[in-house]
Amino acid sequence: YTIQEEGPKDGPDMLRILEPNDRLPGFRNRYFIWRYDLQTGLYEQLTYGHNNTFINDVSADSRYLLFSTSEQDYTSLPHSSNSMYKLDLQSMAVDTLWEKAQYINGATFSPDGKQLMVFGSGNAFDNIGLNIKEGQISNTYDGQLFLYDPATRKAKALTKDFNPNVTSAQWSKFDGQIYMLTEDQDYQRIYTCNPVNGKIRRLDLPEDVIYNYSLAETAPVMYYYGQSVSNANRLYSYNTKNNKTQLIYDLSADKLKDIKFGEVHDWNFTSTDGTVIQGRYYLPPNFDASRKYPMIVYYYGGTSPTNRALEFSYSMHMYAALGYVVYTLNPSGTTGFGQEFAARHVNAWGDKTADEIIQGTEQ
């Protein structure tokens, strides 16, 4: 676990700003890793120093701790670096796996502790996972997955040619597969990746947007929950061996009792540069095709896709219930459509995005 230590304070007469983030509360505080022995009751501090230390993982046999530090570097992209260390909790020997590496977000142990599953962007490990056009700058919000061998210090890209954005992953102890939660266009889906041959397979699961999942360690069982374009959350169990799904609890049936929604239709168009832009529209309940309705166009100005979830801050059905047709789309620069598509967001300043939104609205 980690404990926060309060950092040094400036005197009352003068403030020294060490860097831009020093203006934020708590910037000088530091987090360090401690261990508590349940048998002896001993508290022991494992890390200290100038930088924060973060727990990444503990090996299955509890012998090794994987922890990292990060440092700011405003002279080059992505303006931060990551160092990863493997601590032997018996001998207290530290193995430095990499220092001041860029574009790496974190790592976890494989079930046998011999490899690492590393999260980062395509630029990590000297660009081995990069898949963009010449002249583009990668979108670091587009997550990629790597295998790293601590013995050889070599890494392998697992998702270089995989379009969905990997947001999280778990390495199953039971079947040895890596289960990845992804942004897959306007869906959130779970895929498996075979770490031996790199083969990726999508799990055929109910619900458009899966929020979270949990894997059993000693059985072919996964629990997950999610929702879709016109229903709230439902909880399921999934057998990873025979691929069968069972509904455990339908929260949506309780929450949406006596609520009527309008229809939702997918609608894509091809922009002037030949790009297919994905979108959908929502109709009011009791929609009358002979009438004219005002239309609301919703788009997110960031880089994440507007997914198919029913419940979020700007629910499309809520606006449709007020008598509007609601159109939403995922223009160039959105994650979940491949690295090249996501990279269009960088230094674009909305020019291409605005054109596509206008084109879709007019069509």
Show where each model-derived region lies.
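Predominantly a core beta-strand signature of beta-propeller blades
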Residues: L42-Q45, M92-D95, K154-A157, K199-R202, ...
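Predominantly five- to eight-bladed beta-propeller fold
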Residues: Y1-Q39, S81-N82, G122-F146, L235, ...
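Short coil/turn segments at the loop-to-beta-strand junctions that recur within blades
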Residues: G49-F54, K100-N105, D161-V166, P206-Y211, ...
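Blade-terminus and WD-like Trp-Asp/Gly-His loop motifs, strongest in beta-propeller folds
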Residues: N56-Y64, A107-Q115, A169-Q177, S214-V221, ...
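Short loop/turn segments that connect beta-strands within beta-propeller blades
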Residues: D37-G41, D88-M92, D149-R153, N194-G198, ...
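Beta-strand C-termini and the immediately following turn/loop, strongest in propeller blades
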Residues: N21-F27, T47, L66-P78, W98, ...
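Serine-hydrolase catalytic core recognition
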Residues: N212-Q363
